[in-house]
UniProtKB/Swiss-Prot annotation:
One of its GO terms (biological process) is pyridoxine metabolic process. Catalyzes the hydrolysis of glutamine to glutamate and ammonia as part of the biosynthesis of pyridoxal 5'-phosphate. The resulting ammonia molecule is channeled to the active site of PdxS. It catalyses: aldehydo-D-ribose 5-phosphate + D-glyceraldehyde 3-phosphate + L-glutamine = pyridoxal 5'-phosphate + L-glutamate + phosphate + 3 H2O + H(+); L-glutamine + H2O = L-glutamate + NH4(+). In the presence of PdxS, forms a dodecamer of heterodimers. Only shows activity in the heterodimer. GO terms for cellular component: cytosol; glutaminase complex. It holds the Pfam family SNO. The keyword Transport does not apply. The active site is at residues 89, 180, 182. This is Pyridoxal 5'-phosphate synthase subunit PdxT. Its EC number is 4.3.3.6, 3.5.1.2. It comes from Rubrobacter xylanophilus (strain DSM 9941 / JCM 11954 / NBRC 16129 / PRD-1). Pathway: Cofactor biosynthesis; pyridoxal 5'-phosphate biosynthesis. L-glutamine binds at residues 57-59, 116, 144-145. The keyword Hydrolase applies.
Length: 204
């Protein structure tokens, strides 16, 4: 894979933040695709990784856990040293630079204004077929208390929208999705992350 940051041959090593959320589902898909999944709970677990997935869950709770465990600063450092990051649902919230709601811990690694629970609470969870930039057919998105980006800054590439609301985006080495690809049988977003984001030398 071109652009491998740690220079090792063979399987890319991709961490999955295992503080909360669907980390096991992500790990199973990574394994099927030939990557080496690594559960990440402490800053030292980031060593030697090509990428990191921040799964869904409750973004404020995950953010507070990240602060108390030292993971917030560690993930920022990992990213700014060339590591790839993919945030799904709550991970999308955490990746943003600002939120429309109450203050909460954010990584600030993508220039975007996020609306938490933008599509409503759990009772309003839904599925939708998405037209995704670069995909040859629609992707079935599973939305659970999903956020969306109300606005994005320069350098952020919008990959998918619903009624003008940004639900997938990329900026260099960071990818975000408001939905849960790990809860479907469609592995295209995981393949995209491994190939295009982990394997890229591009910075945000």
């Amino acid at each position: 894979m071109a652009g491998r940051r740690n220079g090792h041959a063979g399987r890319p090593r991709v961490g999955v933040l295992a503080l909360q959320g669907d980390f096991r589902e992500h790990a199973e898909i990574l394994e099927r695709l030939g990557a080496e999944p690594v559960e990440v709970r402490r800053p030292e677990d980031l060593r030697g990784l090509d990428g990191l997935i921040i799964p869904g869950g409750e973004s404020t709770a995950i953010g507070n856990l990240m602060v108390h465990s030292g993971m917030l600063d560690a993930i920022r450092s990992f990213f700014y040293q060339g590591g790839a990051v993919w945030g799904t649902c709550a991970g999308m919230v955490l990746a943003a630079s600002a939120t429309t709601g109450p203050s909460q811990p954010l990584l600030g690694i993508m220039s975007a204004l996020v609306e938490r629970n933008g599509f409503g609470r759990q009772v309003h969870s839904f599925e939708a077929d998405l037209e995704v930039k670069g995909f040859d057919r629609p992707f079935r998105g599973v939305f659970i208390r999903a956020p969306y980006f109300e606005d994005v800054g320069p350098g952020v590439e919008v990959l998918a929208e619903i009624d003008g609301r940004v639900v997938a985006a990329r900026a260099g080495k960071v990818l975000v999705t408001a939905f849960h690809p790990e809860l479907t049988d469609d592995t295209r977003f995981h393949e995209y992350f491994l190939r295009e984001v982990c394997g890229s030398d591009e910075r945000s």
